[in-house]
């Protein structure tokens, strides 16, 4: 049955309630105390339509943006060190920078492209001869080598994740560091010692790959890794060395504090009109609402909360209570049926949300339905469109991952965010959207929330995506899935599995009849992987005696590899070994995506060793009983995480929620250990994704016994399988970001 995408009957599915807040309190007087502003308070960027007042420091760093997912983090790292930075498009010439004046150095970002592509972006070669110090990162490093006479080669084995490299500490960039450093590598193209540009020397190595080159006389430095992210342990020190020892900056850049900048922007955009803000109850939308109230007063801000049918257990009730602290009336609407029945056009015609199994289409339907529902609510509240702006708590990572022009005209799309869909972008073009946090990262928003006086319960709340549980349910039809792989490790279409990972590291027997190693023999692949490991991991791999089983799951998840989006398979590891060999399992999780380019996520399956391959999936769509199943599992897992319930043996569980930054709970259409005589798959599995990060651009999967108590996770496994009907297995996501994103979709 065809269903109209404009079916938004407010009487069909909506329950409108208004939380009448107490009389608004007088906001404290706004003050700007530059003497007490910390380093992270400095704030400058060249983003379209962002009127931020700048105070010139007399020294600036130019960042040439090649579309790196971490491009904005580079800008942030420089600002944290009190040096002014400005972002420019990749085609900016050296002459332009010289004529603008005031630039003391240049940083070239990474990017999603390969230097081998026919139309791969390049830069003005005079960037390297203009006399300014240059730091090239990832793709910028490869261009530095190529444009100075070296070459770059395409590798069979990717490097994606935290790796140990050896560095020359006599080089200015690495002064004060250890000879072995942990860094984030994410690339498939490489430079070897034989292909380094003339007059450049190797200053860092990762196995047999070159991880850094330099010409100190010309003050040119290039690194294959990403020093701007948290996974590079001493990346800030590297930026400090470049800015102060190489470039000669003083670090005297100060500007208005964040709060004042945001308030100034809100007032300049809104003028004497009003704002409608959609509030989810998360920290981003709460801080956005608090800023709007501070800038405009409560009478010019209308806050609404939309229950789209995919909230967590009793989430909307909790939102109403927590947002009362903002002294804003909250208008609550329930639109579950409307969202489920909303449709969008795709290549196969029109698809409804509750019949959709494509993750990108799900996000687009939800994002666009939010905008259409907003119009219905404005009519219900007698709001004049011409008198109101739409406000969103959009963050910088949202825009970067959606490849929005606000963040970078060249960033590769990782996933479409519900607050950055086509309709939202159209409203931006009309100047009708206010996004005061669009230049902020999550940790910066928390700091701003504290400055605004928001309660700890809101400021430290774990993030929850706007589309809700809809993107934590991986949907599937009952059509038999086909495993599809590309690359030198595979020969055409592969319907198979990894059978064993045993005594030798990754010495697995993958169905030889499929001819997987026609282009690359296993032993060569294994040796290449071992070369990329640290000495500790190599010893662990070669000495282990555990029996571990590995199975490819016929489902795809979103990831980021080489600064670009990946949509690849997950691998499930299992073992009979007790205690569970976590160190070894996490070593596998790091290496498997390097060996198998078609894999971007690795999970551990609690319980016994998996015996059978997964040959079909459970029919799964966004219908009420499926959503309820995930709501129950999520509620159980979070109660255990925050110590709200006792363990199965009656002992009190500790509150360990503060030890991680987020824990998505995901439902998979996968039925493990199914009776082979059963006609079809009917159960689901649950994934726990505890995640440790400071900026959500990169991060580490929480390790049992290190970040979280093992007994907490084991208790989650027991409680979910006991109390939620139709659950086959509970899995632990062991994947860092990259190669896996925080969310699975």
Curated annotation (Swiss-Prot):
InterPro entries assigned to the protein according to its UniProt record, in alphabetical order: Class_I_gatase-like, GATASE, GMP_synth_C, GMP_synth_GATase, GMPS_ATP_PPase_dom, NAD/GMP_synthase, Rossmann-like_a/b/a_fold
Active site residues per record: 138, 226, 228
Gene name linked to the record: gmps-1
Gene Ontology cellular component annotations, sorted alphabetically: cytosol
Transferase is among the record's keywords: no
Organism of provenance: Caenorhabditis elegans
Gene Ontology biological process terms, A to Z: GMP biosynthetic process
Domain Glutamine amidotransferase type-1: 60-252
Enzyme Commission number(s) from the entry: 6.3.5.2
Catalyses which reaction(s): XMP + L-glutamine + ATP + H2O = GMP + L-glutamate + AMP + diphosphate + 2 H(+)
SUPFAM superfamilies for the chain: Adenine nucleotide alpha hydrolases-like (SSF52402), Class I glutamine amidotransferase-like (SSF52317), GMP synthetase C-terminal dimerisation domain (SSF54810)
Subunit: Homodimer.
Name of this chain's protein: Probable GMP synthase [glutamine-hydrolyzing]
Pathway(s) the chain acts in: Purine metabolism; GMP biosynthesis; GMP from XMP (L-Gln route): step 1/1
């Amino acid at each position: 049955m065809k269903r109209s995408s404009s079916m938004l009957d407010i009487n069909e599915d909506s329950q409108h309630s208004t939380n009448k807040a107490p009389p608004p309190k007088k906001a404290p007087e706004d003050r700007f105390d530059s003497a007490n502003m910390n380093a992270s308070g400095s704030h400058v960027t060249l983003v379209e339509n962002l009127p931020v007042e700048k105070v010139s420091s007399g020294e600036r760093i130019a960042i040439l943006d090649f579309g790196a997912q971490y491009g904005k983090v580079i800008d942030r790292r420089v600002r944290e060190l009190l040096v002014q930075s400005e972002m420019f498009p990749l085609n900016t010439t050296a002459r332009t920078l010289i004529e603008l004046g005031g630039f003391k150095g240049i940083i070239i970002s990474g990017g999603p492209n390969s230097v081998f592509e026919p139309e791969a972006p390049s830069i003005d070669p005079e960037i390297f001869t203009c006399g300014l110090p240059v730091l090239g990162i990832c793709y910028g490093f490869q261009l530095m080598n190529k444009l100075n006479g070296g070459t770059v080669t395409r590798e069979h084995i990717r490097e994606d994740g935290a790796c140990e490299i050896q560095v020359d500490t006599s080089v200015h960039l690495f002064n004060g560091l250890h000879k072995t450093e942990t860094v984030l590598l994410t690339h498939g193209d490489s430079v070897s010692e034989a292909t380094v540009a003339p007059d450049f020397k190797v200053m860092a190595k990762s196995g047999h790959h070159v991880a850094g080159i330099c010409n100190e006389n010309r003050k040119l430095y290039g690194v294959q890794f990403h020093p701007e992210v948290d996974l590079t342990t001493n990346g800030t020190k590297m930026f400090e060395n470049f800015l102060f020892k190489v470039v000669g900056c003083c670090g005297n850049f100060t500007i208005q504090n964040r709060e004042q900048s945001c308030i100034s922007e809100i007032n300049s955009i809104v003028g004497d009109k009003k704002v409608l803000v959609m509030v989810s109850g998360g920290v981003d939308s709460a801080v956005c609402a608090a800023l709007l109230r501070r800038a405009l007063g409560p009478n010019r801000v209308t806050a609404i909360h939309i229950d789209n049918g995919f909230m967590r257990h009793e989430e909307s009730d909790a939102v109403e209570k927590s947002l009362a602290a903002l002294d804003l009336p909250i208008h609550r609407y329930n639109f579950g049926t409307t969202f489920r029945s909303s449709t969008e056009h795709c290549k196969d015609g029109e698809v409804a949300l509750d019949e959709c199994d494509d993750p990108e289409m799900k996000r687009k339907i939800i994002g666009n339905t939010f905008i259409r529902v907003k119009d219905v609510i404005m009519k219900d509240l007698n709001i004049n469109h011409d008198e109101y702006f739409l406000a969103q708590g959009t963050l910088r990572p949202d825009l970067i991952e959606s490849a929005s022009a606000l963040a970078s005209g060249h960033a590769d799309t990782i996933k479409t965010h519900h607050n950055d869909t086509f309709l939202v972008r159209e409203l931006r073009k009309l100047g009708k959207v206010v996004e005061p946090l669009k230049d902020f990262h999550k940790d910066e928003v928390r700091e701003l929330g504290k400055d605004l006086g928001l309660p700890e319960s809101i400021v430290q709340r774990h993030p929850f995506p706007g589309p809700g549980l809809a993107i934590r349910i991986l949907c599937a039809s009952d059509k038999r899935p086909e495993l599809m792989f590309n690359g030198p490790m595979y020969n055409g279409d592969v319907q198979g599995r990894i059978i064993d990972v045993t005594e030798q590291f990754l010495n697995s027997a993958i169905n030889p009849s499929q001819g997987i190693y026609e282009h690359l023999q296993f032993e060569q692949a294994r040796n290449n992987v071992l070369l990329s490991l640290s000495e500790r991991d190599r010893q662990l791999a070669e000495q282990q005696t555990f029996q571990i089983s590995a199975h490819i799951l016929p489902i795809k998840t979103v990831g980021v590899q080489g600064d670009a989006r990946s949509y690849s398979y997950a691998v499930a590891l299992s073992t009979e070994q007790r205690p569970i060999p976590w160190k070894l399992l996490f070593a596998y999780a790091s290496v498997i995506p390097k060996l198998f380019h078609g894999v971007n996520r690795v999970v551990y399956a609690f319980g016994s060793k998996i015996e059978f391959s997964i040959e079909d999936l459970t029919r799964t769509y966004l219908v009420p009983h499926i959503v309820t199943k995930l709501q129950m599992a999520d509620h159980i897992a979070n109660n255990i995480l925050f110590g709200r319930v006792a363990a199965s043996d009656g002992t009190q569980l500790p509150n360990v929620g503060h030890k991680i930054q987020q824990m998505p709970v995901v439902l998979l259409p996968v039925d493990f250990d199914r009776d082979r005589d059963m006609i079809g798959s009917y159960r689901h599995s649950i994934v726990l994704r505890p995640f440790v990060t400071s900026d959500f651009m990169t991060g580490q999967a929480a390790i049992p016994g290190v970040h979280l108590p093992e007994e907490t996770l084991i208790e989650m496994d027991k409680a979910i399988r006991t109390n939620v009907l139709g659950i086959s297995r509970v899995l632990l996501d062991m994947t860092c970001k990259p190669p896996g994103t925080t969310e699975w979709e």
